A protein has these predicted regions:
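Conserved alpha-helix/loop element of class I SAM-dependent methyltransferases that forms part
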Residues: 1-11
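Class I SAM-dependent methyltransferase SAM/SAH-binding core
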Residues: 15-17, 21-66
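A conserved beta-strand element that flanks and buttresses the S-adenosyl-L-methionine
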Residues: 78
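A short glycine-rich, Lys/Arg-flanked "PGG" loop and its adjoining helix->strand segment in the class I
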Residues: 92-104
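Conserved beta-strand signature within the Rossmann-like core of class I S-adenosyl-L-methionine
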Residues: 105-112
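Acceptor-substrate binding/catalytic loop of class I
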Residues: 123-139
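Conserved S-adenosyl-L-methionine
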Residues: 150-161
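Core SAM-dependent methyltransferase catalytic element
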Residues: 161-178
Length: 178
């Protein structure tokens, strides 16, 4: 809701990175029907599902580590849940690429799983698949974002239950390109 309320124009251009099945896409459109969204995901299956869930949105198969290939500029970028799968180096590149894709004054929304980066490890997801998950603290991001010229707008920590009944804390941040 906070991200949606940041835009004064009626039809801001929004890039969603790592859209998955399009749940965030659908939420954004429900809150701001004027959003002009281009949504990307590395998985063809996820893009097909997202298209079914959001027929009015422009979807593209694209790895979040390759967004520099996009030539359009955006008022906002949303990256709901890619950073847990990106190394520090890939996160830095993602932030740099996002900075270049944003118009002046544009906003970047992203989330990560809070924790000590050195404790990053393989985890089993809800589908039973194992993948490597990276943990981050807000301070892990702050220095890189400051260097690029982003200004912190919003930060919150939110607990989410895991499959094994434990909880993990997600960091949700919004920064603005100066």
């Amino acid at each position: 809701d906070i991200f949606c309320g940041l835009f004064k124009m009626k039809q801001p251009d929004i890039l969603e990175v790592g859209c998955g099945p399009g749940n965030i896409t659908r939420y954004l459109i429900s809150k701001r029907p004027g959003f002009k969204i281009i949504a990307t995901d590395v998985s063809v299956n996820m893009i097909n599902l997202a298209k079914q869930n959001n027929p009015t949105v422009d979807f593209k198969v694209l790895d979040c580590r390759q967004i520099e290939s996009i030539t359009t500029k955006f008022d906002g970028i949303v990256c709901g849940f890619c950073l847990p799968y990106l190394s520090k180096e890939d996160c830095v590149k993602f932030f740099k690429d996002s900075f270049h894709l944003l118009k002046s004054g544009g906003f970047l929304y992203f989330s990560a799983i809070e924790g000590d980066y050195s404790q990053s490890k393989y985890e089993t997801g809800s589908t039973g698949d194992k993948c490597f998950v990276y943990y981050y603290s807000e301070s892990d991001f702050k220095n890189e974002l400051d260097k690029l010229g982003f200004r912190f707008v919003y930060s919150i920590k939110k607990g989410f239950p895991k499959n094994d009944e434990s909880k993990q804390t997600h960091l949700i941040l919004i920064v603005q390109k100066n």
